[in-house]
Amino acid sequence: MRIAISTINDYGNYGNRLQNYALQKTLESMGNDVITIRNMVNPDNETGLKRKIKQQLGDNSYLTLLFEKFFSIFSQTKKLNYSRKVNFLNFTKENIKESNFKIDEKTRRFNFDKSIDCYVIGSDQVWNYSFPRFSKLDFVEYSSKSKISYAASFGVNDIPNSLNNFYRVGLNGIDYISVRENSGKMIVSKLIGVEPKVVLDPTLLLSKKDWQKISTKQVYSEKFILVYFLGDISIDDFSYIQKFAKSNNFVIKRMFSRKDEELWESGPAEFINLFSKAEAVFTDSFHAVAFSIIFNKYFEVFERNFKGPSMNSRIDTLLGNLDLTDRWHSKCEKNKPIDYSKTMKLLNIRKEESLSFLKNSLNKVERSINE
């Protein structure tokens, strides 16, 4: 079948790029022809001259990249951001089959729909109302073709009553629904009376060997721990991590921190390599937890320090399913090895269940097309 993935297109987010790749590879392994729709819901929130020029050049074009390279000569921060974006765009170009067109909220003609047999919505936080990009496009309401959601996430534990009808309309248009978190299951069940399947994030459907195939091969001279925080890291938490590193004779590498300029430039392929080579991981990120598990690393999860609704449900669901709830920093026994023989058995069971949902849903769609 010809399948279109509808997800968030974030060319600066590791988890987003890697889940997109993983879902594509999984669908292709089932014999499908897969493309990801470039779904640009809102224009860049840049202002002034830079925004106007980028609008004229077009989204994600090489001209836009050259424009950003020009601005990068004026500051080290812009230079680092430019290098980082190049790495993300190169990864996308080499590994993700994207449409040569884009759609947004103003699009009125969807001619490509004629060539699509089925849409798969997800994964990632495609249904998070707090994101400025969120719209009807995230339910593919523009098409009457069959729709499946795979590991779609709301990103939050509940939604405002004022949005209930908006979600009901969107969810009722999806033929087969699966979500990534238990909280998402409760939201869907409450809104439309359907109990969706809770499935694994696509990144966990691929094996360690699968990921190593697209990883960089850089070798590091010193043993290191990887620190990857999306929220602010407290003084106490970082002090704890420093003590852990010192007691084990490890150096610290910090991702997503401009204090480590080398790692700030890292793209998704470098991200994979760093997790494969790290001795331990300290994080508040869902996908950092996922890749720690994939590569069987010692890890500790910290509460994310940021303003806004809690996003812990996705981590809670994953850790609960794999009997790893003691990996929260506040609960874990420090330096105690993780029994990955047990964890991987549970992961394989969840993987079989998740793949079964996807295969069965696709088979039903294919039968309906051939009837």
Where are these regions (language model features)?
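Active-site anion-handling motifs in enzyme catalytic cores
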Residues: 1-371
